[in-house]
């Protein structure tokens, strides 16, 4: 797994995207101090997962982002990508799967807001995934393979426990330590889960027993309901049978009328079928007719097309013939021109021969040349005379020339200034034109940057809102969970309390032994304890309990037959038993008595039976029994005295616990205090009823809370997904904003440079304009001096002209003779030019003749081509003429067939009209018969409605269909059924949905169970009574018990699994410890052996060793270094010099590499403390080991630089911005 390349952008001083390639062997990174070499090491540390900003030479992670410079703004993010070759096929986590790619690309990106992204091969990843890539490879952010600047001594100055980690990395037990740490964390979580599970298990177990009893009662009630339903359905089934019997007779009459209707319907159907066949035949003939017509039209169209094609071909033939005629005419003209040009060439050749002959007749120029020489000598003599005068003129001219030169220089300068001004003006205009467009672009890009920033801010706001919503949802969920926990706890408490009260009631504590035994031996459904029948408001419960406490275990029955009680009492005469005798009309409480009691007590007194909630079936028996018992709000001593002995009552109880009892023997009134110990039967009954209501409410609330909690959890998950998506959008928006901002800054920088250039040009233009004005003033002064010299020169020139006139005459004579000589020479040259011109004309004419010859050949080819096309066209015309005749014949035949088919279709339409008339007549007869059938149907509707009403009543009571209910327990007997209903009736009733099934089932049921109708009715009554005696039923108990039991069993299984998990985790940790100890021991010994060998090589002698501090099997033991450089005693490593420490550290690193070579190694200025000799030994070892591992060196040492295969130079061409340049060394 070797390094391939490192790509960094915006990381520390590397503003722009920089790619550093790493090849096999040794790669060096060099450059001046402070240029950013070590930033490459920091980038490697960072992308490998380093989390400490201090280790990356910064105070915080934001220090890693490009901080800007005098010229550039700070960067928006820092990004580093490390590409590794995966030649050894290492498996890594990419996305949601494990794979082994050929290249591993690790990316880490940091934004200014502190957000960090990790990616593996462009898939989002975790920091853990990146760290796992380097685990146990010897490479990584904190491994021995990367030594940062100034950290070479860290290896020797580290604590023994810290050095141990290097040996562990060699031993490959880092992953075991990570797994052990994860296992210990899992153990802690598992133990917490186990404690919570056991607490929950204990809480559920408390309520399970009470739920079991409630569930058994509910099951009994459910069984009774099913029996009630079954017998009720049987009774109603008899009613269905009677109704269907009446229906059958009525439908027999209806069937006869229907048969007649069916005969007419059959005839009508037959006619309609025939009519439909004829319609089909008509459509078929019509379709054939249309197809034939279509074919006829197609032939007609084809014929028209062919005729048009024939016309076009004839026209084409004419055009081709005209083209041939034109080409032949052109060929004739070209041949004539060719003859003319040949004659012209012959004439030009004759002229050329004549010119050449004349040119040969040369003139003798010797005499002319001697005459010219004599004139030349006389001319020179006269020239000398003139020259003397001329020197004086020249002297003046020299002075004038000086002034002229100055004037010329001024003029040149002015022209130069003018040219410069024009160039500058053009450049200024060009720059202004260029940056006028750039300003618009910059404004647009500013808008784009602003838009990107607004989008980023908007996305940030959305992200913030989503975070707030998620926090609110989490808070709401916590509140819901708290409420749910509170309600669940309250529900469990109340269910437990209810169960206890029901168990107390079921145990019949305080009930006479005789009553208990009696209820156990007889049918308990017919007898009830009076205390179980009494219910009242909570305010009166205490008073009712005091008033009726002596009668709470009295037996009550709705049955007037008391023989069973008497018989039991005879058999068990030693057991006490109270039984409420059959009804006796109460005659104690009259309106007069009640009025007297109200006067005595101040009006606030009520008969007790008016305050009780009694079952309907017991009211007739219990109300007389309670006659004479009253409840008053309160009474004191005065009230007691005001009640006369003559007032008839049995007892009066106040709500505050006082009791007035009248002695039935002597009529005396006694004052008593009610019992205040414990809870009475009435209060317990009230409490049970209240608890059942509260439990029902709590169950609804718990269910709603669970639903709300589930919905909010779903919303929370959706919001979290939205937040993740929003973060991705925000990341993209921020990157887009940073890119656009960078582009804007670049353009602004370019515009700023352009503006600077523009200012310089404008300033230069002003300077040139000023210099030009100064030059114009100087030119005026020169002009005045020149005028003065011109006057003096004019006088000299007059004398010179006189002398020079003679010289001119001589020159004229000389020139005349010389011109004559030159004319002869020109004439000869003219002859030569004419010869050349004639030769050129001959060549041009030959060229034109060649072109004409080619044109003639081309025309011949075209004429041949057109002749061939004419022959082809003539063949096509002949073919078309033959084809057109055939199509015209076929068109005529199709017209004949169309006429015949139209006649046949007319005959068919007439036959169809006759059948339609007959169908109309039958329809009238059917309509009249249907009216008669409707009258019959009205007569039997009532029977059907009654049958439906019975079925409907059963459905309303039990939500089932009576037909299905009967079908569930009846068997069919086809023979008996056929005896009852004949074939015609069966056929008729099959047309009515479900009617046969109902009647068949009703008959079958009546045949088999008719004699048991009375028994079914009695059973129905008994089941209803037994169901009513069960009292309040907790229907939820069955489901609650099953759910709680299932949950309890599930928790038991979970408990076993958690305990097993704890055992497995502890076993795994022990296994990890044993394996780690074994590997560490082996690795330590191997590194120690290599260290003993490498140390003398590095130092050129001496000895060294590694030593374990403590027991080597102790997982916390450290590693110490004992070293003895050459000529020194064995000493502690901390006493060594800086260079010796560095050499010792290098020895240790190379020793580790010999045991377990890392795929790559990065050394940052490790050779800085070493002298030349030690650098040489260091380089030799480095060269030997580079065959197994990649080495990246940051160095200032020239010898080390020579060792590198590839060299990167890091520079700062601009302040604060690093750049890297690579050189391949051989």
Swiss-Prot record:
Q: Where does the UniProt annotation place the signal sequence? A: none
- According to the UniProt entry, the coiled-coil residues are 173-231, 269-491, 679-741, 775-965, 1006-1078
Query: Looking at the keywords, is DNA-binding present?
Result: yes
Against CDD domains, the record matches this protein to:
ABC_SMC_barmotin
Biological-process GO terms, alphabetical: chromosome condensation; chromosome segregation; DNA replication; sister chromatid cohesion
Subcellular location as annotated: Cytoplasm
Which residues of the sequence carry a binding annotation for ATP? 32-39
The SMC hinge domain, residue ranges: 527-635
- UniProt keyword annotation of Nucleotide-binding present: yes
User: What does UniProt give as GO cellular component?
Assistant: chromosome; cytoplasm
Q: Which SUPFAM superfamilies match?
A: P-loop containing nucleoside triphosphate hydrolases (SSF52540), Smc hinge domain (SSF75553)
Assembly and partners are described as: Homodimer.
What is the protein name stated in its UniProt record?
Chromosome partition protein Smc
Query: What organism is recorded for this protein?
Result: Halobacteriovorax marinus (strain ATCC BAA-682 / DSM 15412 / SJ)
Organism lineage: Bacteria, Pseudomonadati, Bdellovibrionota, Bacteriovoracia, Bacteriovoracales
* Record gene name: smc
């Amino acid at each position: 797994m070797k390094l391939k390349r490192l790509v960094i952008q915006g990381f520390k001083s590397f503003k722009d995207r920089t790619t550093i390639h790493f090849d096999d062997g040794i790669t060096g990174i060099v450059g001046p101090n402070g240029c950013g070499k070590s930033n490459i090491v920091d980038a490697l540390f960072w992308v490998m997962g380093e989390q400490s900003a201090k280790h990356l030479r910064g105070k915080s992670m934001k220090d890693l982002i490009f901080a800007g410079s005098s010229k550039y703004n700070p960067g928006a993010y820092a990004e580093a990508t490390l590409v590794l070759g995966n030649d050894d096929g290492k498996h890594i986590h990419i996305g949601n799967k494990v794979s082994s790619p050929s290249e591993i690309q690790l990316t880490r990106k940091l934004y200014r807001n502190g957000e960090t992204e990790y990616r593996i091969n462009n898939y989002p990843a975790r920091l853990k995934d990146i760290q796992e890539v380097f685990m146990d490879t010897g490479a990584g952010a904190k491994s021995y393979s990367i030594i940062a600047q100034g950290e070479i001594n860290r290896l020797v100055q580290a604590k023994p426990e810290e050095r141990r980690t290097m040996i562990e990395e060699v031993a490959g037990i880092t992953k075991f330590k990570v797994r052990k740490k994860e296992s210990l964390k899992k153990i802690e979580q598992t133990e917490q889960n186990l404690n919570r599970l056991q607490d929950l298990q204990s809480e559920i177990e408390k309520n399970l027993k009470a739920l079991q009893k409630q569930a058994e009662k509910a099951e009994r009630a459910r069984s009774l309901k099913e029996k009630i339903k079954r017998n009720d359905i049987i009774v109603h089934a008899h009613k269905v049978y009677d109704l269907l019997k009446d229906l059958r007779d009525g439908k027999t009459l209806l069937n006869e009328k229907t048969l007649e209707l069916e005969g007419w319907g059959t005839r009508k159907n037959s006619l309609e079928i025939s009519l439909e066949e004829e319609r089909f035949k008509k459509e078929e003939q019509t379709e054939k007719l249309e197809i034939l017509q279509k074919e006829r039209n197609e032939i007609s169209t084809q014929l028209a097309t062919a005729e048009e094609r024939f016309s076009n071909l004839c026209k084409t033939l004419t055009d081709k013939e005209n083209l041939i005629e034109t080409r032949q005419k052109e060929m004739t003209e070209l041949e004539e021109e060719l003859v003319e040009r040949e004659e012209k060439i012959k004439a030009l050749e004759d002229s050329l021969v004549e010119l050449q002959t004349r040119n040969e007749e040369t003139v003798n120029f010797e005499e002319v040349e001697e005459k010219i020489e004599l004139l030349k000598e006389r001319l020179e003599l006269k020239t000398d005379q003139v020259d003397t005068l001329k020197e004086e003129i020249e002297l003046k001219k020299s002075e004038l020339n000086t002034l002229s030169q100055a004037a010329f220089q001024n003029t040149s300068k002015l022209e130069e200034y003018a040219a410069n001004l024009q160039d500058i003006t053009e450049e200024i205009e060009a720059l202004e034109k260029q940056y006028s467009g750039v300003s618009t672009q910059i404004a647009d890009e500013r808008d784009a940057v602003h838009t990107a920033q607004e989008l980023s801010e908007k996305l940030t706001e959305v992200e913030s809102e989503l975070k707030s919503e998620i926090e609110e949802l989490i808070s709401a969920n916590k509140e819901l969970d708290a409420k749910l926990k509170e309600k669940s706890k309250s529900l469990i408490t109340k269910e437990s309390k209810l169960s206890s009260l029901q168990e107390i009631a079921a145990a019949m504590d305080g009930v006479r032994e005789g009553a208990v035994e009696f209820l156990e031996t007889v049918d308990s459904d017919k007898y009830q304890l009076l205390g179980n029948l009494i219910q009242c408001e909570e305010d009166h419960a205490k008073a009712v309990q005091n008033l009726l406490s002596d009668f709470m275990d009295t037996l009550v029955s709705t049955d007037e037959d008391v023989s069973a009680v008497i018989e039991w009492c005879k058999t068990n005469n030693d057991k006490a038993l109270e039984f409420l005798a059959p009804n006796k009309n109460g005659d104690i409480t009259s309106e007069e008595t009640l009025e007297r009691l109200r006067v005595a007590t101040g009006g606030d007194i009520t008969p007790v039976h008016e305050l009780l909630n009694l079952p309907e079936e017991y009211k007739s028996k219990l109300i007389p029994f309670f006659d004479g018992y009253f409840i008053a709000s309160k009474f004191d001593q005065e009230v007691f005295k005001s009640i006369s002995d003559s007032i008839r009552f049995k007892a009066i109880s106040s709500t505050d616990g006082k009791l007035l009892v009248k002695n039935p023997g002597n009529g005396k009134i006694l004052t008593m205090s009610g019992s205040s110990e414990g809870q009475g039967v009435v209060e317990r009954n009230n409490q049970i009823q209240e608890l059942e209501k509260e439990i029902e409410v709590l169950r609804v609330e718990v269910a709603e809370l669970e639903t709300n909690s589930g919905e909010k959890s779903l919303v929370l998950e959706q919001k979290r997904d939205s937040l993740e998506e929003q973060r991705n959008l925000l990341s993209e928006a921020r990157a887009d904003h940073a890119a656009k901002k960078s582009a804007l800054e670049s353009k602004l920088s370019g515009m700023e440079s352009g503006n600077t250039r523009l200012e310089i040009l404008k300033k230069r233009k002003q300077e040139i304009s000023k210099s030009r004005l100064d030059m114009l003033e100087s030119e005026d002064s020169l002009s005045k001096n020149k005028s003065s010299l011109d006057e003096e020169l004019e006088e000299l020139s007059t004398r010179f002209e006189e002398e020079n006139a003679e010289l001119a005459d001589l020159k004229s004579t000389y020139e005349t003779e010389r011109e004559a000589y030159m004319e002869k020479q020109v004439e000869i040259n003219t002859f030569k030019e004419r010869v050349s011109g004639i030769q050129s004309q001959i060549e041009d004419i030959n060229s034109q003749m060649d072109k004409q010859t080619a044109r003639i050949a081309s025309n011949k080819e075209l004429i041949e081509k057109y002749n061939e096309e004419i022959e082809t066209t003539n063949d096509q015309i002949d073919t078309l003429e033959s084809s057109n005749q055939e199509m015209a014949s076929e068109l005529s035949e199709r017209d004949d067939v169309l006429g015949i088919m139209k006649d046949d279709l007319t005959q068919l339409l007439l036959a169809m009209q006759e059948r339609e008339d007959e169908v109309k007549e039958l329809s009238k007869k059917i309509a009249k018969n249907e009216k008669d059938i409707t009258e019959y149907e009205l007569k039997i509707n009532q029977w059907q409605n009654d049958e439906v009403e019975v079925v409907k009543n059963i459905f309303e009571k039990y939500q089932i269909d009576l037909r299905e209910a009967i079908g569930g327990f009846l068997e069919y007997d086809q023979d008996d059924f056929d005896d009852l209903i004949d074939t015609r009736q069966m056929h008729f009733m099959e047309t009515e949905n479900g009617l046969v099934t109902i009647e068949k089932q009703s008959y079958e049921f009546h045949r088999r169970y008719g004699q048991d109708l009375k028994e079914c009715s009695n059973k129905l009554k008994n089941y209803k009574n037994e169901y009513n005696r069960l009292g309040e039923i907790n229907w939820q108990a069955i489901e609650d018990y099953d759910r709680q039991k299932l949950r309890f069993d599930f928790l038991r299984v979970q408990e076993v699994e958690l305990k097993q998990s704890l055992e497995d985790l502890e076993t795994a940790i022990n296994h990890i410890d044993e394996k780690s100890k074994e590997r560490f021991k082996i690795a330590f010994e191997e590194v120690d052996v290599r260290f003993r060998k490498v140390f003398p090589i590095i130092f050129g002698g001496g000895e060294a060793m590694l030593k374990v501090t403590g027991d080597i099997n102790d997982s916390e033991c450290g590693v110490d270094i004992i070293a003895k450089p050459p000529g020194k005693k064995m000493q502690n490593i901390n006493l060594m010099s800086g260079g010796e420490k560095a050499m010792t550290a290098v020895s240790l690193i190379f020793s580790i590499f010999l045991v377990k070579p890392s795929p790559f190694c990065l050394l940052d200025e490790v050779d800085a403390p070493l002298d030349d000799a030690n650098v040489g030994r260091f380089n030799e070892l480095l060269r030997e080991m580079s065959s197994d591992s990649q080495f990246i060196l940051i160095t200032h040492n020239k010898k080390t630089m020579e060792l590198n295969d590839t060299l990167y130079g890091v520079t700062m061409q601009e302040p604060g911005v690093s750049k890297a340049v690579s050189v391949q060394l051989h």
